[in-house]
């Protein structure tokens, strides 16, 4: 998609029904985030989740997807965990941090969405992760200038969460963050006695 100049739209979801809605909407990547621990289960830390739990969530999400690519965060950082998410969970890509782990998983033939750490020089890190075999880069919480420099420095897509500017190759958002305005509009329509979608 980067070569074609088409931006990548991604959403983070944790269940079959939402995955189905995202897939029908034309999302390119449905990402199963380890944020499930905090956002869905109310745990105190975002990464407080096991491979077995991610496997369960990934399987549910994959059941709702017919077209989009399913990516899954890999807790624990093991090659065996990545293999399980692909073989048993329906993931087509895994998201990890760290050059060595990216290289090990990529050598095994599994596409990797590699997270930039945000420590040090982002361009150098991005080039190293691409050289290690990353199929795409996750660059969150970046400024616009850093986003442009990283996107220009590598041939793989650079997908941003918060920040990064229009130069990034795509965006990833947790689906619940996209619901604020539509949900508020729904409440306003109901209270005003107006028809709502689905009536």
Residue ranges of each PLM-predicted region?
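Alpha/beta enzyme core
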Residues: 1-199
């Amino acid at each position: 998609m980067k070569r074609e100049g088409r931006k990548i739209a991604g959403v983070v979801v944790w269940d079959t029904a939402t995955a189905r809605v995202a897939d029908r909407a034309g999302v390119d990547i449905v990402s199963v985030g380890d944020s499930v621990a905090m956002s869905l289960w109310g745990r105190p830390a975002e990464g407080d989740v096991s491979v077995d739990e991610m496997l369960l969530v990934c399987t549910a999400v994959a059941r709702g997807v017919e077209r989009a690519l399913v990516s899954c965060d890999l807790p624990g950082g093991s090659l065996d965990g990545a293999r399980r998410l692909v073989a048993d969970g329906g993931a087509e890509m895994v998201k990890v941090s760290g050059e060595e782990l990216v290289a090990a998983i990529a050598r095994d033939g599994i596409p990797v969405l590699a997270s930039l750490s945000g420590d040090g020089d982002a361009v150098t890190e991005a080039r190293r992760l691409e050289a290690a075999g990353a199929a795409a880069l996750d660059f969150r919480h970046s400024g616009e200038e850093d986003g442009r420099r990283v996107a220009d420095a590598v041939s793989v897509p650079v997908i941003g969460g918060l920040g990064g500017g229009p130069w990034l190759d795509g965006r990833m958002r947790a689906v619940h963050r996209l619901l604020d305005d539509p949900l508020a509009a729904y409440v306003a329509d109901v209270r005003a006695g107006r028809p709502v979608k689905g009536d």
